[in-house]
């Protein structure tokens, strides 16, 4: 496969076709509707207002954040909504929540116990959660459906920016080409690379085609890869479960590796790992 072909593949994976985009949007819409069934009824109006301004994946992220927010409010014994049923909260209940309650929520998000699992969030993740809460309050306040907007009184976490180095399309194509061909390697490196080429191509294609984090990629279990629905199940940095859909190019690369993976014998404790190292352990 030459460089030109790889560039075409990259564009298809990143930009996606209109048909795939519609399918992806439908899947995310179904997921959002399922989440809204367990959230306060008034949130349906808010998410309807986002229909033509936010991408489906963004709305899913907002729903996760607000789900965590309302879980905190009904489970925290200092909250004015403590002990109430999350799904049956009324819009008027938002007026009972103070800026101190929201600050408590952000502090809680730093690290909390979720059914025996410790969930942590970075400052950027906490900032996103506050943005989600602010967006909800801003909408209902603007529509004169609540009396105040306490979220504006809560300071945003300070995020230290890092320079992001991005690859151009031709650089990505060359990278994938080198992975497949083993170009620019020593004889020893080429020998090792030949054994891992299918895995490495699958790993890189998945990363580039979905935008997931490296940690999410290497953390995949065999059962997390769903070829029936062309999606993977990942656990986000904040501990939230998410499904990410992939296109045909990613699917083909993953199937090639999955077939090769069947012949490997993982070390004890690594049987569930999808991506294996040379030592047949989970990557990482």
What are these regions (language model features)?
Residues 2-284:
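Conserved catalytic core of the tyrosine transesterase superfamily
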